[in-house]
Amino acid sequence: MGARIVGWGHTEFGRLKDDLEQLIVRSAREAIEHAGVDPTEIDGIWMGHYNGGLVNDGFPSSLALQIDPKLRFTPSTRLENACASGSAAIHGARNAINSGNTKIALVIGVEKMTGKDTKGVTESLMTASYQ
């Protein structure tokens, strides 16, 4: 038996006033509820997040612990792979499940690109390319 996706959640797309933490919490709570799991059953969190200076928080994986107090002390890992950061998080969680180290994983892909003007976002996105 391999890894499978059993629940999901997402925010609407667009220019949202929510900060990064609010986006993480809102979508992850929805995914946990949709999956029908208790947060105590989650034994690993993988977060795909490309920063590149888009937000001031350089350590967003710890923000996942705000989703539910029951997630306190749950290992949370951030993966960054430019535009494929969310996919990298899925692969990381899948590998942990298939290895037997994790039974139930929470995978989060998050980005906040509307906190800067066009020039600022362009400069941030350029950091994902060879310079």
Predicted regions located by residue number:
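Condensing-enzyme catalytic core mediating Claisen C-C bond formation in acyl metabolism
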Residues: 1-21, 30
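Conserved catalytic cysteine-centered active-site region
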Residues: 4, 51-104, 108, 112, ...
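Buried hydrophobic positions in well-ordered alpha/beta secondary-structure cores of metabolic enzymes
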Residues: 6, 31, 42-45, 86, ...
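A short, structure-level motif marking secondary-structure boundaries and short turns
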Residues: 12-14, 47, 78-79
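Metallocofactor- and cofactor-centric catalytic cores in central/energy metabolism, strongly enriched
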Residues: 18-25, 41-47, 52, 59, ...
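Short, well-ordered amphipathic alpha-helical segments that serve as non-catalytic structural scaffolds
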Residues: 21-36, 60-61, 89
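Short secondary-structure boundary/capping segments within folded domains
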Residues: 35-39, 54
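Short acidic capping loops at alpha-helix termini that bridge into adjacent secondary structure
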Residues: 38-44, 75, 103
